[in-house]
Design a protein with these regions (language model features):
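Short, solvent-exposed, Trp/other aromatic-anchored flexible loops in extracytoplasmic proteins
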Residues: 48, 63-126
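A short beta-turn/strand-edge loop motif at beta-sheet boundaries
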Residues: 49-54
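Low-complexity, acidic Ser/Thr/Pro/Gly-rich terminal tails and inter-domain linkers that flank the onset
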Residues: 1-43, 47, 122-126
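Beta-strand signatures of extracellular beta-sandwich domains
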Residues: 56-60
Length: 126
């Protein structure tokens, strides 16, 4: 029996923006071999001394030659309790709006800490 999902693309490991409280430790694009749908998965790692309770990422779908497929989508990781050096997000499948997506760019745009303070990416480059 064949695998349900095929890996189509992997992000470079440990993507970081200066001053960010997290790194994108890993990312993959998976194709569902039963439905044809495409999903992204990200593994984020807290590198801040503060506990994270929520994070928002932005994902830009790209086609086979790296051209954007529409606007970037946002995805929120909620109800977290991620302490320093712990990972989150790897079990969340983020549906891509276009089934022709073959790669993507990702960035963390906001992190909310347990003390309700907020980090915003502003012009951070991942």
């Amino acid at each position: 029996m064949s695998e349900r999902y095929s890996k189509v693309f992997s992000l470079s490991e440990n993507l970081y923006a200066e001053g960010a409280p997290v790194v994108i430790a890993a990312g993959a694009l998976l194709k569902d071999n039963q439905t044809g749908r495409v999903v992204a998965q990200l593994k984020l790692r807290n590198i801040s001394p503060k506990t994270i309770k929520a994070a928002t990422v932005s994902i830009l779908s790209l086609n086979t030659v790296g051209n954007p497929l529409g606007e970037a989508i946002r995805y929120e990781y909620l109800d977290l309790s991620s302490t320093r050096d712990t990972d989150f997000g790897s079990k969340s499948a983020i549906p891509m709006p276009d089934i022709t997506t073959r790669s993507f760019n990702a960035a963390v745009v906001e992190v909310i800490f347990a003390d309700n303070s907020i980090w915003n990416a502003s012009e951070a480059v991942w």
